[in-house]
């Protein structure tokens, strides 16, 4: 390869290293619904569609006898949120358990601006799924599930 062509190729390659990752420009902040989250970034909808929850765990979640609320604190800019929030949505959809509900809260990327979005909760990493039974926290999934979203929920709920 001639020297001028090598220089051009080198410039093109090095310039591409500084292109920011493509993601939606606007952060999702505060209370936000499932549909808005999935519409915000199509890759999240794809991740939800592709996720295959464990059928045995889903059966256990369907057997809930008490109301369970999951408070989901996530960052629309966060790769761990992009992996695990869509998985939770698929679990909720496939479990189809009326007593299992989620409320989602978007959090800013800038750490110094996050406190008001945590509603007084102690949250250090995202996503954080707070699992509440009768309004009392019984467990949480922080950043990455130990096994899977559905298996961790079953464990936390003692099902």
For the regions a protein language model found, what residue spans apply to each?
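Structural alpha/beta surface segment adjacent to cysteine/selenocysteine redox centers
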Residues: 113-126
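Stable alpha-helical elements in mature extracytoplasmic
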Residues: 57, 84-87, 149, 153
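Local sequence-structure signature of Cys/Sec-based thiol-disulfide redox active-site neighborhoods
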Residues: 63-94
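Non-catalytic, surface beta->alpha helical segment in thiol-disulfide oxidoreductase systems
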Residues: 125, 131-159
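Thiol-based oxidoreductase modules, predominantly thioredoxin-like and allied folds used
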Residues: 72-76, 99-113
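Bacterial N-terminal signal peptides
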Residues: 8-17
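N-terminal leader/targeting and pre-domain segments
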Residues: 23-65
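Bacterial N-terminal signal peptides that target proteins for export
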Residues: 1-8
């Amino acid at each position: 390869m001639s020297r001028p062509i090598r220089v051009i190729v080198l410039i093109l390659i090095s310039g591409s290293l500084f292109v920011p990752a493509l993601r939606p420009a606007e952060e999702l902040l505060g209370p936000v619904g499932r549909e808005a989250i999935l519409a915000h970034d199509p890759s999240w909808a794809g991740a939800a569609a592709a996720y295959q929850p464990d059928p045995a765990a889903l059966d256990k979640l369907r057997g809930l006898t008490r109301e369970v609320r999951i408070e989901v604190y996530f960052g629309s800019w966060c790769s761990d949120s992009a992996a695990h929030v869509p998985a939770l949505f698929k679990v909720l959809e496939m479990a189809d358990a009326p007593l299992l509900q989620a409320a989602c809260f978007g959090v800013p990327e800038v750490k110094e601006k996050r406190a008001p979005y945590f509603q007084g909760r102690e949250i250090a990493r995202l996503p954080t799924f707070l699992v509440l039974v009768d309004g009392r926290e019984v467990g949480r999934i922080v950043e990455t599930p130990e096994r899977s979203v559905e298996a961790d929920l079953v464990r936390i709920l003692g099902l």
